[in-house]
Amino acid sequence: MAKLSLIERENKRAKTVEKYTAKRAELKAIIADQSRSDEERYEARLKLQALPRNASPIRQRNRCSLTGRPRGTFRKFGLARSKIREIAFRGEIPGLTKASW
């Protein structure tokens, strides 16, 4: 089980990303727009750099929803590989079967 503080940090990052998503998209559109003046695009770049670091979605880490494990997490299920294995053996994930060939 991951430390609760790390899980809460990720939750805080997710809220920050959600809060600044529209503003980041607006500034990025200004920066990418070639028809705008260089000064205007430069100002938009400075404003984008002034936003909090955690406002960038790239800083988010996928974690297991049960244990908080940061590695070996499957996006489809939102669970760590070890928990997927346990739950799948109990038959609680519909359509998931053990591979055999």
Curated annotation (Swiss-Prot):
Signal peptide: none annotated. GO terms for cellular component: cytoplasm; small ribosomal subunit. GO terms for biological process: translation. InterPro entries: Ribosomal_uS14, Ribosomal_uS14_bac/plastid. Keywords: Ribonucleoprotein, Ribosomal protein, RNA-binding, rRNA-binding. GO terms for molecular function: rRNA binding; structural constituent of ribosome. It comes from the Bacteria. Part of the 30S ribosomal subunit. Contacts proteins S3 and S10. Binds 16S rRNA, required for the assembly of 30S particles and may also be responsible for determining the conformation of the 16S rRNA at the A site. Belongs to the universal ribosomal protein uS14 family. NCBIfam families: PRK08881.1 (NF006477). This is Small ribosomal subunit protein uS14. It comes from Polynucleobacter necessarius subsp. necessarius (strain STIR1). The gene is rpsN.
